[in-house]
Amino acid sequence: MITRKQYPNHHVYETEIGGRAFTVETGKVAELADAECICRYGDTVVLTTVTCNPIPKAGIDYFPLTIEFEERMYSVGRIPGSFNRREGKPSERGILNSRIIDRPMRPLFDEELRNDTVVTCTVLANDYDNPVEIVASLGASIAIACSDVPWNGPVATTNVAHLNGKYIINPSSDERDAADCFVCISSTFEKLVMIETEAKEAPENIVYECIRVAHEANMEIVKFINSIVAEIGKPKFTFEKAAVNHELLDDLMAYGLGKIEYALDTPDKNVREERLTAARLDFQEKFGEKYEDFDTHIEVCLYKMQKKVVKKWLLQGKRVDGRGMDEIRPLDAEVGVLPRVHGSGLFSRGQTQVLSICTLNTLSAAQKIDTIYPEDTKRYIHHYNFPAYSTGEARAARSTSRREIGHGALAEKALLPVIPSVEEFPYAIRVVSEVLSSNGSTSQASICGSTLALMDAGVPIKRPVAGISCGLISDQETGEWRTFTDIQGVEDFHGEMDFKVAGTTEGITAIQMDLKNKGLTMEIIADALERCRKARLEILSEVMLKAIPAPRPEVSEYAPKMLSLKIPVDKIREVIGSGGKTIQKICADTGAKVDIDDDGSVFISAVDSAAAYAAKKMVDDICFVPEVGKLYYGKVVRILPIGAFVEIAPGHDGMVHISKLENHRVEKVEDVLNLGDMTWVKFMGFDEKGRANFSRKDALKEMANQ
């Protein structure tokens, strides 16, 4: 006898988000995971699981948290396009979604937790209209909050779009694309912990309001999650925090805090590192024999000493390099720094330096995307490379990191609103940003460098884009806080916020905010937005526009020459020809490449303009349709007893009947026209068989009356 499996811990919870039902189901699947839930929003469904190793990992000084965002092609009813028809490594957007989940959650874990923790979000169904990253983020928050892993959550995540004067919660893909401002916000009940923004030069007040609306929606979601935790949440396990030799720390503070202050008090990163190394050697000589565990604890002690100094100085309005709180490091911008490439820009901000290179190609070079999202091609691509030498490290090159993918996507998002349409500029565009030197804010430097490279390449961008970052330091006991402009490496490392804002003179195009504290108030957000606005305008006017005031009028001589035109859809077959013979002949005769879309868009590329225009003329000739009543100048290509055939365009001829040759009776066609003669004719229309009929007589009469 078979017994039916029971699910005694099965629970279903439901709330409403953005006017649509959001359902959470637990206790039915993945029973061996520490916690799990299936979240459904419309027809988007995500399974989230949490597993945690009960034994702490030895020999590390960080919390080993891993967020896995698993895309499944069956979720959209498709089979993967790979050779073995299996999902491979995560897509770029999948990696970005895992970062969206990771970034708001990580600061809320105890930094001294050492247990391997893995959160896996598997997309089971995706309807495109209900954002999968939101469902996964909420599922991760619910699963961790209900697990026994210590965490200071929950957090909620909401998308908001500003479209036609309205603020839409969790917009569909179409609404997101049409919106002038789109934000993804994660927050606890009290504070914001993550901001992602993409906008079409939106003013700061619109961005601020989007953030506020999202935070209000998140507050209600946090209440909902807390109600679930109250019913089924597990008690959190206790753990032994990483031991710190407080006696050693006290001795170091008393003896060496002044040495740390001296080491940090310089604008030069190399000098700072040399001084810190000297201080460490001095400490080892002084206390190495006294404390047997000196080597075990010295790095933690040095970190705490540096953090104390940086925090004290910043709260006092002092920075390690002597700048004011709103002062930007020395800037420099150059264009045309490389030969042969289509466009290049070198942007330097203090000891941060980025070289960006722009490459133009035919639209067939656009990136093909095989994912669970609606987008299937990408015409504008930005790649960001962060080699070890940029920070002075001796480390071999490795595969592209998630950080590099994230920074590349941020720069891509920042510049996309100013990239011309395919009709205005029918090129595929790739920009690569090479970080040559890193001392903070390389992602924002890559945005500035990429703008320079695009303009140098002759890409007619709407307006230049610049990026700047803003930092934060606060005192949790007093509530005091200070923001500061253009953070450098040591301020990023010991500070609490990296608030990156990119935009033009007209408004914001992208924001990314990362935190190391427990969250921000809306007051801090408003302050950071205004601080970044002022700095952005200064960078554009004082440096970038002086390097290159406007995009170059022509693309590089080494770039392919592109033309675009539109033909009737019913003419596509004629242009392609039987088995592709016609289009192949066009390419062979001119040396150009011709691509045709299903909507009749034709894109022609060639190494020089003459070849491109020759191919365009051949396409125009094939698609030529005469207008009734219009005069045409053509060549006699054939003579019959009943009339002459006149070709008015390559491949387009028609008959002039003998009765239509002259105003008087004509006995013989050759009395008026001979083979090869040029003559004016008037198009009279097509007969029932689709044959063109011309009249020379009517053409001459009309010309005589003009």
Report residues per predicted region.
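Glycine-rich, flexible beta-strand/loop modules in the N-terminal catalytic cores of phosphate-handling
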Residues: 21, 33-118, 123-125, 130, ...
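Long, basic N-terminal domains or extensions that often function
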Residues: 2-240
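Flexible, glycine/charged-enriched surface loops at secondary-structure junctions
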Residues: 111-117, 152-154, 221-239, 270, ...
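Long, charged amphipathic helices and adjacent flexible linkers at domain junctions
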Residues: 235-246, 538-565, 613-633
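Mobile "lid/hinge" segments at catalytic clefts and subdomain interfaces of large enzymes
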Residues: 148-264, 454-553
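Conserved phosphate/anionic-ligand binding catalytic regions in large, soluble enzymes, centered on
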Residues: 35-37, 130-148, 335-358, 439-459, ...
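Extended amphipathic alpha-helical scaffolds
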Residues: 2-53, 61, 238-374, 560-574, ...
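Single-stranded RNA-binding regions, centering on S1/OB-family and related RNA-binding modules
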Residues: 558-562, 569-706
